[in-house]
Amino acid sequence: MMHDDPNEAGLPPDDAALPDEAADGADEVNPLHHRRIRSFVTRAGRVSTGQRRALDEFGPRFVVPYAAEIPDWDAVFGRSAPRILEIGFGMGASTAEIAAHRPGDDFLGVEVHEPGVGALLKLIGEQDLPNIRIIQHDAVEVLEHMLAPESLDGVHIFFPDPWHKARHHKRRLIQPPLVAHLASRLKPGAYLHCATDWQNYAEQMLEVLGAEPSLENTAADYAPRPDYRPITKFERRGLRLGHGVWDLVFRKRAG
């Protein structure tokens, strides 16, 4: 999930007890789930009246139920177009803005938290954005079961939870098994765009993405922010305070 101000987003303190800590060793069998890497953190969140209304009104059209099978995505979107996956869209403001400025592309947002799903549905209704669909489920399982190899034209992962304490780095989303799986779902020439405001995580991203043999960096190291990625309010505030933001854009090698 995209993180915002840690207090506003309800992030647990980094030294908080985590419910599946004891089960970390149980996932050695499936490398994609190594040490219970998930695309989300379990959090409580209140759904507002407006979000609930949007869930009821727009959910049936724009939310795709999770299923362990690959749907006909052209039928789901009502057309054949370049398809971009976003993992963890938070409250959806950036997703909506990108979709509005790229009407020729289709965007599949994966987010587990209901307030965020409701918030994006509200924006879809207000801005008439027909090129977005949402899956409210763990992105790791969506990748495994709902997306075919070489079916994506791009992947966005903006400001994933940083897990900044060293002992929790194993919980970060960007790790070799997931990156390899993401790369397998990209078409040759398609891109993977990550962004973070934690330098240590940026360094880890650069190392992990650079080690994936099917990907190549589009820059010497970090990329300039692509014009399509909006600057969030939280990011703008951080930049004013002198905090950094790092974008990484890799492409799937041809052949």
Curated annotation (Swiss-Prot):
Residues binding substrate: K165, D197, T232, K233, F234, E235
EC number: 2.1.1.33
The keyword Acetylation appears for this protein: no
PROSITE patterns per record: SAM_MT_TRMB
Chain residues that bind S-adenosyl-L-methionine: E86, E111, D138, D161
Catalyzed reactions: guanosine(46) in tRNA + S-adenosyl-L-methionine = N(7)-methylguanosine(46) in tRNA + S-adenosyl-L-homocysteine
The keyword Calcium is annotated on this UniProt entry: no
Cited SUPFAM superfamilies: S-adenosyl-L-methionine-dependent methyltransferases
One GO cellular component, as annotated: tRNA methyltransferase complex
Entry superkingdom: Bacteria
Start and end residues of each stretch annotated as Disordered: 1-29
Class of this enzyme: transferase
Coiled-coil regions, chain positions: none
Biological function: Catalyzes the formation of N(7)-methylguanine at position 46 (m7G46) in tRNA.
Protein name, per record: tRNA (guanine-N(7)-)-methyltransferase
Organism, scientific name: Burkholderia ambifaria (strain ATCC BAA-244 / DSM 16087 / CCUG 44356 / LMG 19182 / AMMD) (Burkholderia cepacia (strain AMMD))
Lineage: Bacteria, Pseudomonadati, Pseudomonadota, Betaproteobacteria, Burkholderiales
Gene name of this polypeptide: trmB
